[in-house]
Amino acid sequence: MSLTESPQRRRDLRVLVLSADVGEGHVAAARALSEGLRALGTVDVVERDGLSAFGPITRHLIRDGYRWQLRWAPWTYATGYWLFTRLAPARAIGALALSVTGQRRLRRLMRRDAPDIVVTTHPALTCALGRMRMRRRLAVPLCAAITDLADYRLWSHRGADLHLVMHEHALAPAKRSTGARACSCITRCRSAPRCDHRR
């Protein structure tokens, strides 16, 4: 910015919020974060379905495979969850697979939207982007919004610059799983659900 340029002409901070349409929880979290950021008045928010960056095959496996598991074979979901949360090699293989399948499209998405900050509300996106961030293939800060009170080894990533958690009891496990140097709990953060008052 030149010395004669008015501060009001600065470009707003652009935040790219990436979610996944596998369940309303991820989408609702992205919507609440986006609305809160827009309310600041100085933030340009772009919302995307991040799963599309992994390509049709991986997206189908993550989204439709999850729904199939819960409906027809819940034990397979429980088994997979146990593997990814308890066994580091399984997490490493999963992270590598997500990085390989999504890295090129995710980098293309970054070039297109040119964000200053990226926020994710799904662990697959956090994993892929966190790995990219650690390898310096993502140049902007990464924020992971953790909307689950379950095992944080699945939801968090050491490559993320910031983790947002839902409850103060999540601070300690999140710190252990990420190696964070500082933790604090956000209070007075309000979100009003949308509802039809005519019902």
Where are these regions (language model features)?
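Hydrophobic packing residues within well-ordered alpha-helices of enzyme cores
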Residues: A30, L129, A174-K175
